[in-house]
From Swiss-Prot:
Family assignment from sequence similarity: Belongs to the metallo-dependent hydrolases superfamily. Adenine deaminase family.
Pfam families with a match to the protein in the record: Adenine_deam_C (PF13382), Amidohydro_1 (PF01979)
GO biological process, one term: adenine catabolic process
Name of the protein in its database record: Adenine deaminase
Cited NCBIfam families: ade (TIGR01178)
InterPro entries membership: Adenine_deam, Adenine_deam_C, Amidohydro-rel, Metal-dep_hydrolase_composite, Metal_Hydrolase
Organism: Gluconobacter oxydans (strain 621H) (Gluconobacter suboxydans)
Presence of keyword Hydrolase: yes
Record-listed E.C. numbers: 3.5.4.2
UniProt keywords, alphabetically: Hydrolase, Manganese
Class of the enzyme per the UniProt entry, highest EC level: hydrolase
Keyword rRNA processing found: no
Cofactor(s) this protein requires: Mn(2+)
Length: 565
């Protein structure tokens, strides 16, 4: 290390040629907001010189472009990109995301510690700096069947891994507020590190108590007044814009130069189709500026503020001593990325091809005790005053509705006239044969069934449909393929996307996943679906830590009271 330090010192002073120099660029200073012509000198993976001229062994002609620090996605689930960490790397890094802080709790809910082992091994080999927050709540609640349970000892075993930042989103709010021993043990074990929050709609003294546990960031704010209270109480609010949860427009009125140290950006869940059509963090920056945010505030939130919030002191600025994560832009306000430097390396196909790929784990994870039948989907009882989930497009929060539904010989039926479909959650981890049954409004589904083995957070199979036979067909198809998404009508598979890695991720290139998603969306529309992202919207129906009405393999849950209805 001593020799490395002395090389940096010598090259920074100009005593010897730097390893790489970026010439003829305008550096966007995140302290003052100035655009300053300069060379950027790099030694290995570190910046060693700015605001001067340098000679280098290698040189990049900036051609007058604008240099900004690499972007940091402060909270995401790689699994929600539907591809492996290596394809995520190849898909997202060209959009300027040089650091991604992931929570592998999707895979952890299926595989337990094996998910941490896989992600940490992959993180050592990706080009981007993939960091891991350890999944704090596996399972999220006791009101569902998960594939694994992680206790404090499981988490502590990874605490000092160099790729680990701290604890991921602490979703068990009642456990924190009521002093659940398992929750308190986890909070105490990571008290000297970062603890990420998950606090939808929390306010007042309940929020105070939650923050007093040592939690410092939150990505679940969906309204400006909610976010304002949280930043006033010391939280860093991570403004989220994913494939389902779209909170940016509601929150960016709070983001300005004065408040930017207390805001960062995240995507949480964003798939390759959205990335292809819109972008990743580059889209969030571009959209924020379109909505009136000053560029200085937007780029600070995307890098410097994010680095500060998560204790990554070696990045977030283009300055000597910082990690050489640099994005070259053709246009600052439109955030048009032209080149990316990650740890001093120009990002290109050759760099991606040099990686050593870690073999995927969790194959054949969809385990049903027997094929399901149409009879398994039946809902018995009265149709009067039935609890119904109301889907809100662009949100994972649902409405708690009560509607009268049609009946036939003691069975409650879906009602396309009211836009009400049946929804079932089928346990798929081989532990039991549970099936939760209920109803949902808002898909627009007129016929057939849609099913997904992605079902946050325990990832049982969630299926929505108007036909019990098609619903059963869809569930059985997912077991045969090892998991994924499928659209079925009249007993025929119209389209599917295979996700054999833990039933969550494809082992195919991200371009193929993107193309398969296009076909799936088109198939869903022929069945009447009106949602822009029906499969990810479907995948959040079983998440009982998000208000107001949800469904697991145990049944329908009133999230406010955490009781079955």
């Amino acid at each position: 290390m001593q020799k490395t330090i002395m090389r940096r010192v010598a090259q920074g002073q100009g005593h010897e040629p730097v390893d790489l120099v970026i010439k003829n660029v305008r550096l966007f200073d995140l302290v003052t907001g100035d655009l300053i012509p300069t060379d950027i000198a790099i030694c290995g993976d570190r910046i060693v010189g700015t605001y001067g001229e340098y000679e280098g062994v290698q040189a990049i002609d900036g051609a007058g472009r604008i240099a900004v620090p690499g972007f940091i996605d402060t909270h995401l689930h790689v699994e929600s990109s539907l591809v492996t960490p290596f394809e995520f790397d190849r898909c997202v890094l060209p959009h300027g995301v040089t650091t991604a802080i992931c929570d592998p709790h999707e895979m952890a809910n299926v595989l337990g510690r094996a998910a941490f082992d896989y992600f940490l091994a992959a993180a050592e080999r990706t080009i981007m700096d993939l960091r891991v927050n350890l999944s704090s709540c596996v399972p999220a609640t006791s009101m569902e069947t998960s594939g694994a349970v992680l206790n404090v000892d499981d988490l502590v075993a990874y605490r000092h891994h160099p790729k680990v930042i701290g604890l991921a989103e602490f979703m068990n709010i009642p456990g924190v507020l009521n002093g659940d021993p398992g929750c308190v043990d986890k909070l105490a074990a990571f008290a000297d590190g970062h603890i990420d929050g998950h606090a939808p709609l929390m306010c007042g003294k309940a929020l105070n108590g939650y923050l007093a546990a040592g939690i410092s960031t939150d990505h679940e704010a969906t309204a400006a007044d909610e976010a304002l209270e949280k930043v006033r109480k010391g939280m860093t609010v991570l403004i989220r814009e994913g494939s389902v949860c779209k909170d940016l427009e509601a929150l960016v009125p709070l983001l300005n130069v004065a408040t930017s140290p207390f805001f960062a950006f995240c995507t949480d869940d964003r798939n390759p189709l959205e990335i292809a059509h819109e972008g990743h963090l580059d889209f969030l920056i571009r959209r924020a500026i379109e909505l009136g945010v000053e560029p200085l505030a937007a780029y600070r939130a995307a890098s410097l503020s994010a680095a500060t919030a998560f204790g990554l002191r070696d990045r977030g600025q283009i300055a000597p001593g910082k990690r050489a994560d640099i994005v070259l832009l053709d246009d600052l306000e439109r955030c048009q990325v032209s080149d990316v430097i990650s740890a001093g390396r120009l990002v290109n196909d050759a760099l991606f091809n040099s990686r050593e790929i870690v073999s995927p784990v969790g194959l054949e994870s969809v385990k049903l005790p027997r094929p399901v039948t149409a009879q398994d989907m039946a809902v018995e009882g009265s149709g009067r005053d039935r609890p119904v989930m109301g889907v809100i497009p662009g949100q994972i929060i649902t409405e708690f509705l009560r509607l009268d539904l049609p009946e036939d010989h003691g069975h409650v039926l879906p009602d396309p006239e009211q836009d009400v479909a049946k929804v079932c959650v089928v346990a798929r981890h081989g532990h039991n044969d549970n099936i939760g049954r209920g109803f949902v409004r808002g898909f627009g589904l007129k016929e057939g069934a849609l099913a997904s083995s992605v079902g946050h957070d325990s990832h049982n199979i969630c299926v929505v449909g108007t036909s019990d036979a098609d619903m059963a067909c869809a569930v059985n198809h997912l077991e045969k393929t090892g998991g994924g998404f499928v659209a079925v009508r009249n007993g025929q598979v119209l389209a599917d996307l295979c996700l054999p890695v833990a039933g969550l991720m494809s082992d195919a290139p991200y371009e193929q996943v993107r193309d398969d998603l296009i076909i799936l969306r088109k198939a869903a529309k022929t069945m009447g679906v009106v949602l822009e992202e029906p499969f990810l919207q479907l995948a959040f129906l079983p998440l009982p830590v998000i208000p107001h009405l949800k469904i697991t393999d145990f049944g329908m849950i009133d999230v406010r009271t955490m009781s079955f209805v």
